[in-house]
Amino acid sequence: MYGYLRETDDSTAINYSAYGKFLPGENTGFQLLTIGAKFLRIFRVNPYVLKEPGEDNEEWQQKTKLECMFSCRLLNKCQSVAVARVPQLPDQDSILMTFDDAKLSIVAVNEKERNMQTISLHAFENEYLRDGFTTYFNPPIVRTDPANRCAASLVYGKHIAILPFHENSKRILSYIIPLKQIDPRLDNVADMVFLEGYYEPTILFLYEPLQTTPGRACVRYDTMCIMGVSVNIVDRQFAVVWQTANLPMDCNSLLSIPKPLGGAVVFGSNTIVYLNQAVPPCGIVLNSCYDGFTKFPLKDMKHLKMTLDCSTSVYMEDGRIAVGSREGDLYLLRLVTSSGGATVKSLEFSKVCDTSIAFTLTVCAPGHLFVGSRLGDSQLLEYTLLKVTKESAKKQRLEQQNPSEIELDEDDIELYGGAIEMQQNDDDEQISESLQFRELDRLLNVGPVKSMCFGRPNYMSNDLIDAKRKDPVFDLVTASGHGKNGALCVHQRSMRPEIITSSLLEGAEQLWAVGRKENESHKYLIVSRVRSTLILELGEELVELEEQLFVTNEPTVAAGELLQGALAVQVTSTCIALVTDGQQMQEVHIDSNFPVVQASIVDPYVAVLTQNGRPLLYELAMEPYVHLREVNVNETSFATFSEQISTQLTSVSIYSDASQIMKKNTVDGRDEKPENAAENGHHVAVPKIKKEIPDDDAMLYGEDDDFLYGDAEEDEPMVAAESGESSTRLQNTRKRKRLGHDAIMSSRGGEQSDAIDPTRTYSSITHWLVVAHDNGRITIHSLPDLELVYQIGRFSNVPELLVDMTVEEEEKEKKAKQTAAQEKEKETEKKKDDAKNEEDQVNSEMKKLCEKVVEAQIVGMGINQAHPVLIAIIDEEVVLYEMFASYNPQPGHLGVAFRKLPHLIGLRTSPYVNIDGKRAPFEMEMEHGKRYTLIHPFERISSINNGVMIGGAVPTLLVYGAWGGMQTHQMTIDGSIKAFTPFNNENVLHGFVYMTQQKSELRIARMHPDFDYDMPYPVKKIEVGKTVHNVRYLMNSDIYAVVSSVPKPSNKIWVVMNDDKQEEIHEKDENFVLPAPPKYTLNLFSSQDWAAVPNTEFEFEDMEAVTAMEDVPLKSESRYGGLDTYLALATVNNYGEEVLVRGRIILCEVIEVVPEPGQPTSNRKIKVLYDKEQKGPVTGLCAINGLLLSGMGQKVFIWQFKDNDLMGISFLDMHYYVYQLHSIRTIALALDARESMSLIRFQEENKAMSIASRDDRKCAQAPMASEFLVDGMHIGFLLSDEHGNITLFSYSPEAPESNGGERLTVKAAINIGTNINAFLRVKGHTSLLDSSSPEERENIEQRMNTIFGSLDGSFGYIRPLTEKSYRRLHFLQTFIGSVTPQIAGLHIKGARSSKPSQPIVNGRNARNLIDGDVVEQYLHLSVYDKTDLARRLGVGRYHILDDLMQLRRMAYYY
């Protein structure tokens, strides 16, 4: 048994976040870093996102959003994160990450290549440091000094590693000190932070020298201590400078307070304490649960009646601290200072707003707070400080107080008047501030995935339903979130457009929607045929245009719009037609003997390419009338350049740049500044003309000097070339300041972002011509002068980084070309009589086709088209490169570079290699002598503002989302498409039109606005508002059964009196936090509106938990030899220690009833058929061969459902606690809480159940989920555990290590760094499979994929492999680590090996599972590296590509 594992979608939860300057460059601003399990993202705050008009307003509004600028995936889960400026990169922040068990990596974004660069690696994994431990290590913690002098990491909880950041050192050298060497009592460290304001780096430890538990609190409490340790990084010396003992025993975390206050805040579950070396401590207690269990002096705030366990906090400013609780509430902790403002005298704690359940809090730009969550959506909040006037505050206080309490006689005022007035002023200051929060943006999270199921495809158009389709079409529904963030998530792997109308157009090849009406809807639909063109007028219906406005007697090559849609342009084989307002304005005949094969239309230019590779350029002129004017290419520098390289052009396209990235370098290599540099949203350095105001004066007077004295400094001499421009900029700056512009920017987060305001850069849009040559070179020319500004050599190699060719490289390439031409002539003369000449010629032509760039376009994607992406088709693959600003030494050229994105789109459906082992012919052959464009950029389709549709056999949508960068979504459900165009109409707002390849059907469609296509897995999230535990789809009723719960505080305890349980109510005071056991309910959800079906709620008893819910097919008496499907539920009643644990088995069915008026979804009801209490806890359920298998504690029972009753057939004693069961035919997998997994076999003829085999590893971790891996006649068993391991077992009684079949044989074990709680099996996707023989296809179809969802929101699959593919990919996995450096320096074998590392006794070679995340890095290598690596493996690169592409497509469902 061999397998292939790959995570297809990255985690959506966020574990860590930080704010800093992570992207290199002078004008990049500050960014937000988020890490979720293994997925790292860097965001910028973009305040210029356009929001479409709503019902209230008719104009577009600007809003603030988080925009992903960089993302990457790690090999292993990150355990802790810190940020620092290291000496190697002083101009940007570096990221320090720790990994299991004691690894530390320092990484940063590389300026030249825009990838994650590893700066320093540190491994502290030593047998001596472990002190004999093999498991249960303390997680590694990393912290950095606020002054960037050093970093510290906790190693195995017993040692501290120090990393000094010496300024003149080229390397970061670390050293380790045992904690016991600092102080013998320093042990059991809970947290540590660096303190600010000390001469030397000082670490504050929170530790517990003598541990205690809540059960021993009556004898030992106040056990927590802190210790401040000064670190001398030069002499490697430690000194204890501060100690405080007898802190409350519930303290668990520290928060360092910056200057001028200093000190630290200690957070506990029930207490908050502020500590400072110079002032007495102060603290508060939050409830009465702690009464009698601490002697630490605490201020009474028990009226809050809350706890802070699992909380997180962050320091904001001015003594304010944001605290997030586990209930999803955000609190404000205020450090109240004395009159001098330097010492803290008390704490104030209050609730400010509701948020997601926070796991991390980070203060971003001024006035912005990021809430990162693992259980709900992460949020970007804006907060503003509200001040209440003293009169209103005093009036409010007078209303609240009793008049008799505030009456003061004359003697009091005469004696204490000043003190009374000061006290009243202090009270006014305390009450006059409050924070108001508002949500700006949220990052969607679909984790944790607790349960998932398949469901009927929702939103499925009738035109897409095909009875002959073999592959299933389904939705994946998951139970996600927790508490108030609980939700149902509906996932659709492929795009399913909503078909509005469909019609047959025989002979149609391409289509375009052009021309705009006043309401922005399209006027015409141009349909190109083989020898003619059909023009359809768009209105309520599609009607053929009778007027002769367009050219109809020739096929159309391209069509588009100029003047923002006012002018429709049609390019045919021989001419160009301009149409506006129902009349043809101009018809330009192209001066060429060869027909036009390609064209690009971008306002105000039209570029065409003829069949002989000659480019022609036209520009729209407005004087003396609107017409197209041809630009004489022969008079530009392009003609000279073409003669020098003497190549034929294969593609031309025009790019309109709105990102402000494409700027020419000046003579010294720097970027040229556009004319409106101060207007474009970048914070460009303005020449300083007015004098700087001293800091003290600025604090006192601010900018009042401008108002009082004007601008006398303006008369100072200026540089003549910039005087007018600079004065204009300064004048504009002054105007904005007077209008409060800075305050507006601060509230929107724009002052620390390099985002561009599109309203200011609209006038500075530049245009460029992208040209592809037949020798694999891509050049970029400026328009309209066609000057060469950038050239990419050897693009056919598809390197990871594209840079501008230097003059030396160009000369070298010319010489190599001349040498190759001479050698070719000699070989031609020698091989005139050789029989292999013809074969060599065929191979040479095939090689030329593989190196040919068929299409190349630069498309502006993302928010405000700020991310230019180079999309090219080469060797029947679509490759993507993202442009970024980079230093270019060549004057007059663009200061940009391109980095390859980890996305590869294959355009073939058949394998690259034939049966004879040779390269198969190209599928992208020219039809009728023409090759139509496959790259279709668009603006505004449904909720997607811009994107690209790739046509062909595998239609793919490209979206550059703000959530995580570039995402690809296939649309293969309707087969291959040969034409696509965006379409806007009164009936179909922001839709699209496409044409199928197979039947030439024209379909007008739109995308579902409810789904979020920014996500890697398109999803629709339905908020439920409570914890969702389980979800199951009932096919017969087309309904979803959902088990959920809400916490319900309880003061009851059950005791046994005379063999009966009785309730005892324990009265507690009103400030006591009562335990809140969950109250479970069962609901039916309809897929019509994704809401609970009215009047179907089934409530369970108090203290009763639902442990399992399954749809079980059981043998039915009503059907001869048939099965009826029922909904089965298992429950456990846990009333405490004294009452025996019982449980129930409930069998019910969903029946159809008459719906209530106005409630169409109320046509379903739950009918309970069986409901009885069992003699033990019912912990698992499944159906096995028409019978019901149930786990009850340490036993397994099998039942037959007959006469609405369960009749016991057989039982089996297991180990400790069986809590999950999975079955297939007559075998089942039983998971035990301590004894891993067992294989159960049921023999129906003997009514006997037995353990066939089990996993008896002593080092086995606690299991979480299991599933079968089906490979035709063979079957394997998958197991996930709490350490993130996935283990593959097989039943091999003939193997000696299986001990005659008693042991399950371990075939593979891998650690993916995330916990898996849900598996599903599904047939492989075979629609795009082009196998060589029916036998091979049958074998492939019998292999099933096992899908998994993790608690971090990621998804993946495991698929069986043939031995031939396994050996090929296994060798690839072994060698690929030497070619591709891994992020953070993680070693492939070390990072992905099972944890904890233990010898495996029941398996010989536990490496039979291929790591798809590693081997798929091969797809993103350059062609040279691919060929070299394949040669080392002894195969061709196309063989490996075929294996990987087939595995990808087998897992890409409808």
Swiss-Prot record:
SS bond partners: none
Subcellular location(s) per record: Nucleus
InterPro entries referenced in this protein's UniProt entry, alphabetically: Beta-prop_RSE1/DDB1/CPSF1_1st, Cleavage/polyA-sp_fac_asu_C, RSE1/DDB1/CFT1/CPSF1, WD40/YVTN_repeat-like_dom_sf
Superkingdom of origin: Eukaryota
Biased amino acid composition, Basic and acidic residues: 812-843
Keywords: mRNA processing, Nucleus, RNA-binding
Assigned GO CC terms: mRNA cleavage and polyadenylation specificity factor complex; nucleus
UniProt region (Disordered), positions on chain: 810-843
Entry keyword NAD: no
Annotated GO MF terms: RNA binding
GO biological process: mRNA processing
Major location (coarse): nucleus
Function: CPSF plays a key role in pre-mRNA 3'-end formation, recognizing the AAUAAA signal sequence and interacting with poly(A)polymerase and other factors to bring about cleavage and poly(A) addition. This subunit is involved in the RNA recognition step of the polyadenylation reaction.
Family the entry assigns: Belongs to the CPSF1 family.
Subunit architecture: CPSF is a heterotetramer composed of four distinct subunits 160 (cpsf-1), 100 (cpsf-2), 70 (cpsf-3), and 30 kDa (cpsf-4).
PANTHER family reported for this sequence: DNA REPAIR/RNA PROCESSING CPSF FAMILY (PTHR10644)
Protein name as it appears in the record: Probable cleavage and polyadenylation specificity factor subunit 1
